[in-house]
Amino acid sequence: MRVLGVDPGLTRCGIGVVDGGRGRTVTCVGVGVARTPADQELSARLLGVAEAVDEWLDTHRPEVVAIERVFSQHNVRTVMGTAQVSGIVALAAARRGLPVAFHTPSEVKAAISGSGRADKRQVTTMVTKILGLAEAPKPADAADALALAVCHLWRAPMAGRLAEAEAKAAALARNHKARLKDARQAAAQRAARTGGVQR
């Protein structure tokens, strides 16, 4: 499976593509950062990120897009920009019929380093090691994008099995409810035919 990971941001949007093999084998296909100047109009910045994401999607043709889930921070302006970029990336994926997965920073850190509290340096070190890179991806946004892609590759099979189990459980519950309803209706019809006398 090929995953495009995105660490959304207006000034620096990290983008990384990773291929998953057997087991936990992963290979870096490409990594980069889409940059926009802070003094540019918001619409122009969003367009710049959108064009970069489109190019990555069309060049690398991933099967799924993994985006970091936006959490509220102290700087509302930063959160807004990050959320807007996330929306643009999700839209670009949807236009190509690609599924989009959102992962929290702690999910990514836990998948990559074993600890949801790992710092950026630890995540970068582990991403470099896991992917067998000659040097660490820079800046941290690039490493984070690769970490998102790896996280999705490693979590997706379990998430898929969980979703399948939940769907089966829901189907069993629906069938059980339908059988109960049918049994109650049949009992009511028998009671009506016999004048309410149960035999």
Swiss-Prot record:
Q: Where does this chain mainly localize?
A: cytoplasm
What residues bind Mg(2+) 1, as annotated?
D7, D141
Q: Where is the active site?
A: D7, E68, D141
> Which PROSITE patterns does this UniProt record tie to the protein?
RUVC
GO BP terms in the entry:
DNA recombination; DNA repair
Q: Which Pfam families match?
A: RuvC
Q: How cofactor binds (record note)?
A: Binds 2 Mg(2+) ion per subunit.
Cofactor(s) it depends on: Mg(2+)
A single Gene Ontology CC annotation of this entry is: cytoplasm
HAMAP family annotated for this entry?
A: RuvC (MF_00034)
Sequence similarity: Belongs to the RuvC family.
Which proteins does it associate with, and in what oligomeric form? Homodimer which binds Holliday junction (HJ) DNA. The HJ becomes 2-fold symmetrical on binding to RuvC with unstacked arms; it has a different conformation from HJ DNA in complex with RuvA. In the full resolvosome a probable DNA-RuvA(4)-RuvB(12)-RuvC(2) complex forms which resolves the HJ.
- This protein's name: Crossover junction endodeoxyribonuclease RuvC
Native organism: Saccharopolyspora erythraea (strain ATCC 11635 / DSM 40517 / JCM 4748 / NBRC 13426 / NCIMB 8594 / NRRL 2338)
